[in-house]
Regions:
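Bacterial N-terminal signal peptides
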Residues: 13-23
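Bacterial signal peptide processing site
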Residues: 25-28
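Short, internal strand/loop/helix patches
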Residues: 123-163
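Bacterial N-terminal signal peptides that target proteins for export
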Residues: 2-13
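Post-signal peptide N-terminal segment of mature Sec-exported envelope proteins
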Residues: 34-54
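Short active-site neighborhood of thiol/selenol oxidoreductases, capturing the structured segment around
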Residues: 68-86
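A short, hydrophobic beta-strand/beta-hairpin element that forms part of a small beta-sheet core
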Residues: 163-178
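Structural microenvironment flanking redox-active thiols in thiol-disulfide oxidoreductases
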Residues: 89-130
Length: 185
């Protein structure tokens, strides 16, 4: 009789646990596109070309497209970031815009997913917003397609696992260095 009661209790606990877990929402495992509202989804499109970019749109991009565009600029800075990041290395986007302007960099702001999109959209920036196109890399996990994007930017094998930072500096389209944080001034 005791075994039957214990089994029933275990089933009940499993049932409660499954209800609890089904109501959880994990942000950042994938690109989180499915968690966006229909209105937000409509404002995200694949980049066709770098002309007439709207402040109201987020453009999905891959590193190959970006590298082609980087060739047009003497100096460029790519900041690949996570929306709503609270790390010591994450600053408001305006800080990156100010730094790029002061140092004559063309700035490209590239999100690595769509979770916490409201935290980015609530900031005032003049630069267009881009997002890594995970579908291009045929990977659904954010950590994987972000690594592939970063490595392709640096002309490294896609599967290399060394993370050096999210700020990429280019001169005449050639990768120069990666930074974790903006230099102190």
């Amino acid at each position: 009789m005791e075994k039957k009661a214990k089994k029933k209790e275990q089933r009940y606990l499993m049932f409660l646990l499954s209800i609890l877990l089904s109501s959880c929402s994990i942000i950042g495992l994938t690109n989180d596109f499915g968690k966006l509202t229909p209105t937000e989804k409509n404002k995200i499109i694949s980049l066709k070309k770098f002309e007439k970019l709207s402040q109201d749109t987020i453009y999905k991009i891959n590193a190959s497209q970006l590298k082609q565009e980087l060739l047009k600029y003497e100096s460029a800075m790519v900041y690949e970031f996570t929306n709503g990041c609270s790390s010591e290395y994450c600053r408001p986007l305006q800080v990156y815009e100010n730094y790029a302007q002061k140092h004559h960099y063309k700035l490209f702001l590239v999100m690595n997913g769509f979770g916490n999109l409201d935290k980015t959209k609530s900031q005032t920036v003049t630069s267009p917003l881009f997002a890594i196109d995970g579908d291009y890399y045929k990977k659904c996990f954010r950590s994987v397609y972000t690594r592939y994007f970063d490595n392709e930017l640096r002309d490294k094998p896609l599967k290399d696992k060394d993370w050096l930072g999210g700020i990429f500096i280019f001169e005449h389209g050639k990768y120069v260095k990666t930074l974790q944080d903006l230099p102190k001034e």
